[in-house]
């Protein structure tokens, strides 16, 4: 089952290469492809489908990847309960959801505080 799930980045990326001409821009097509294909890559190379690591992972895919992990944590799923935002940020920071760029973790934490998703620490 997990092997089937791990195919979705490849399927999504292939779909972005079949957009009708004139519907989108070349740059948007590139970003769409990179996000679809690489949003499950992890900074330490442990992700999929290509095992990219660090800055080999396009920044747009890194951003979507960390936000996707956060969203998965704070929402109920059939296989797990949802976590509070503070716990989700802690889990991401501690690498419990795979490795992310320290800079992106700082950005996510700052955004969460700014939007009052987290309790502000004085």
Regions found by a protein language model. Give the residues of each.
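Histidine- and acidic-residue-rich, metal-dependent catalytic cores
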Residues: 1-122
């Amino acid at each position: 089952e997990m092997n089937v799930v791990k195919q979705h980045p490849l399927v999504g990326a292939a779909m972005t290469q079949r957009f009708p001409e004139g519907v989108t821009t070349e740059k948007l097509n590139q970003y769409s492809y990179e996000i679809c294909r690489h949003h499950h890559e992890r900074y330490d190379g442990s992700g999929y489908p290509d095992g990219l690591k660090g800055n080999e992972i396009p920044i747009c895919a890194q951003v979507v990847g960390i936000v996707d992990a956060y969203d998965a944590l704070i929402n109920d799923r059939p296989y797990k309960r949802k976590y509070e935002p503070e716990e989700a940020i802690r889990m991401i920071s501690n690498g419990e959801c795979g490795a992310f760029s320290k800079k992106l973790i700082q950005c996510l934490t700052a955004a969460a505080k700014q939007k009052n998703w987290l309790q502000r620490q004085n």
